[in-house]
């Protein structure tokens, strides 16, 4: 059992929403789209080493490395065209 928590949503609902958005934007070409949209999954843990372990687990599935941003923050991202999929580790004192 891990000491970290990965805050993610319902996979099927998320994918259905992406398909719905794609269909809507395709059917409505006058609707503006964001230049650099992103999706983020947060990793929570009380200490930096455990947070890093959670990040490594999530980043492995994406096939990307974890970047140590300093001060307890970690980042892993994969780009899909202009869209970023991020996993972010945030220190406990900065979580809201």
Predicted regions and their residues:
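Actinobacteria-biased recognition of intrinsically disordered, low-complexity terminal regions
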Residues: 1-9, 96
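Short interaction-hotspot residues at assembly and binding interfaces
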Residues: 2, 37-44, 73-77
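Contiguous, amphipathic alpha-helical segments that mediate oligomerization or scaffolding
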Residues: 6-37
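Generic hydrophobic, helix-prone segments enriched in Leu/Val/Ile
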Residues: 21, 55-60, 85-87
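Short glycine-rich, basic-tinged beta-strand/loop micro-motifs
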Residues: 31-52
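Short, hydrophobic/π-rich interface segment
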Residues: 45-71
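C-terminal edge-of-domain segments
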Residues: 70-96
């Amino acid at each position: 059992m891990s000491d970290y928590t990965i805050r993610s949503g319902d996979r099927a609902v998320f994918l259905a929403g992406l398909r719905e958005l794609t269909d809507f934007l395709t059917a409505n070409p006058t609707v503006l789209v964001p230049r650099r949209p992103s999706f983020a999954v947060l990793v929570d843990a009380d200490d930096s080493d455990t947070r890093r372990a959670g990040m490594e687990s999530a980043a492995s599935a994406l096939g990307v490395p974890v970047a140590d941003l300093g001060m307890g923050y970690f980042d892993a991202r994969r780009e899909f065209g202009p869209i970023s999929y991020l996993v972010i580790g945030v220190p406990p004192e900065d979580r809201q």
